[in-house]
Amino acid sequence: DREGRTDGKTASLFSDYPEKYMIPQLKEVARKYDVNGVWLDAECWGAQLDYSEKARAAWKEFSGSDEFPEDGAAEFEEFKCMHRLRFEEYLRAWVDALHSEFPQLDCCSNWAYTTMMPLPVRAEIANISGDFDPFLSVDRARTECRYLENTGYPWELQSWGFDIVDGQGPCRKTVAQICQEAAVVMMHGGGYMNYFLPTRGGYIPESV
């Protein structure tokens, strides 16, 4: 962050992590297990503003300034724009790298080119995908479906089969809730998935 604290969960878009680790690992998976596609989570929706020295160098090249702009400053929107452009560069880089060796591999980045990233598709992805919030899922699906059905790409949405409420564990949704969520997606022509958490042994409760 701006104070120099690092994030233990988020990789910098300006680092060599994709080239050094992620892309080789994805190629290994494709080569070793003959998978037909990859779906990467926590991509555009997990991206953070970067205040590292590599980001500073990129910002200087982008804007000519040595200093990061303050939130609310006139240049702050340009600072965010730089990160958006960098994310798309990163997305195209890993997709193109995989296709260079596995041209038939279907690549998908969760929530890319949806309302979370409302841009024309500029990466060689196979489809558009997202998993919407466990709360108010029907309303979220209604908004997202109207956008996705106009992209010209195959798309799918996944709803959670349970709610998570502060102070209590996961609460399984009713059949009626899940049917409503699925109906909204399917009536707009999208693919539908439902997300449950099986046990480590793969057991799925009978009620599911």
State what each model feature region is.
Residues D1-Y33, W59-K80, R92:
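Active-site-adjacent "subsite" loops/lids of carbohydrate-active enzymes
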Residues E3, G8-T10, Y33, A42-C44, ...:
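Generic detector of bulky aromatic hydrophobic side chains
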Residues M22, V29-A47, M193:
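Short acidic catalytic loops
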Residues D41-S65:
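Short, solvent-exposed beta-strand-terminating loops
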Residues D1, F14-S15, S52, Y203-E206:
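Polar helix-capping/helix-linker motif
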Residues N36-D41, P69-C81, R86-V208:
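Hydrophobic targeting/anchoring helices
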